[in-house]
UniProtKB/Swiss-Prot annotation:
Keyword Transmembrane: no
GO function term, MF aspect, one: lyase activity
Alphabetical keyword list: Flavonoid biosynthesis, Lyase
Active-site residues (renumbered): H86, H111
Subunit composition and interactions: Homotrimer. Each subunit contains an active site, located in the central part of the hydrophobic core of the monomer, which functions independently.
Primary enzyme class: lyase
InterPro entries: NTF2-like_dom_sf, Scytalone_dh
Protein name from the UniProt record: Dehydratase cfoI
Function: Cytochrome P450 monooxygenase; part of the gene cluster that mediates the biosynthesis of chlorflavonin, a fungal flavonoid with acetolactate synthase inhibitory activity. Within the pathway, cfoI is responsible for the hydroxylation of the flavonoid skeleton at position C3 with cfoF. The pathway begins with the PKS-NRPS hybrid synthetase cfoA that uses benzoic acid or p-hydroxybenzoic acid as a starter unit with four rounds of chain elongation using malonyl-CoA to form the chalcone skeleton.
Pathway: Secondary metabolite biosynthesis; flavonoid biosynthesis
Name of the gene: cfoI
Length: 172
């Protein structure tokens, strides 16, 4: 059995750059806990499929506002003592049409629990949990702009205790 490498023949360089910019902004939005950046990246309706990573979260369709509120809540990346960095590696374009591009990125999702709880960047990290894997994004063109309408991570491995790192503030 062979693997056929997909080479998009109809992908304009400007669309490629736009998708990469949206992806980077999406990753930064999580790490900066920035709702405006998040809203700039997602379609009016976005599917989040965490079934391969955290099965209890399953796959769910959100409005853009619901997604941002959910993801920046204290039980997700909005926990003030949680420091994150989501690094996207080389993109693999799985399909490309005029109105839809599917990209799978290599991903390192680094999570650290601050020992101080002021929520400021920097500071001392006491516990960490880092995941390595891939994240698939589907981009759709809306009013001439590329937006993410599917986020589907998968994992190769996790180092550290993710559940412990993301526990509620004050919990031991």
């Amino acid at each position: 059995m062979t693997f056929d490498i997909y080479i998009p023949e109809n992908l304009a360089f400007s669309d490629y750059i736009a998708v990469i910019q949206v992806a980077r902004t999406w990753a930064d939005a999580q790490d900066r806990k920035d709702p405006e950046r998040f809203l700039a990246t997602v379609a009016p309706e976005v599917t989040i499929d965490y079934s391969l990573l955290i099965p209890a979260w399953k796959s769910k369709v959100y409005t853009a506002d619901e997604f941002v509120a959910t993801w920046l809540a204290p039980d997700r990346v909005g926990l003030s003592v949680l420091a994150t960095q989501h690094l996207l590696g080389m993109p693999y374009i799985k399909s490309a049409t005029r109105d839809e591009i599917v990209v799978e990125f290599q991903e390192v999702a680094s999570h650290g629990r601050r020992q101080d709880d002021d929520g400021a960047f920097g500071g001392k990290i006491g516990e960490t949990a880092d995941g390595r894997g891939w994240v698939e994004h589907r981009y759709v063109k809306i009013d001439g702009q590329w937006k993410i309408d599917l986020i589907k991570p998968s994992i190769i491995y996790m180092a550290g205790d993710w559940e412990r790192v993301r526990r509620a503030e004050g919990a031991e």
